[in-house]
Amino acid sequence: MISLSLLAALAMAQAKDERLAKIEQELKGDVPRFLCLNENFATAGQPADAAFAKLASHGFKSVLNLRTDAEGVDLAHEREMIEKAGLHYINIPIGQPPLKEDQVKAFIAAVKDKKNQPMMIHCGSANRVGAFWMVYLVLDQGASEDKALEEASRIGLTSPALKKAAQDYIAAHKQVAK
């Protein structure tokens, strides 16, 4: 009986992994650094307009954009394309380090809100996504900094300045929590 349950669980896990791999394969041409972290979250660099309808067809409910107007992107156009695809649009403009408390709180609130899931989180290159995801994993989910940094790097965190900003934010806020 236990072995049948184990086999069923393994089959379900494999089916989920195959589903996520299929989504990644379908979107990789339209979305740089597209990565399905799990059933509820995907991360990416700047998506092409065509990606939003594909996300919706795979059951995504929202897109969280961390880009700013100062980057020369048309945020209004992106919002229009996302909403046209039937997705909820969230923008938390993140500029240069350091990470700001209001931005981190808004990020964590958006990520934790179940009505936003599944959610794709993006910026220009996935650097900021990785930095904010790292902070979320450590401060909200209780992950170790090493594990969080590993996942942030996989997402796209390559900037030494953003890595340091995330580590500094974590250090400052871990001390406050103690």
Where are these regions (language model features)?
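Bacterial N-terminal signal peptides
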Residues: M1-A9
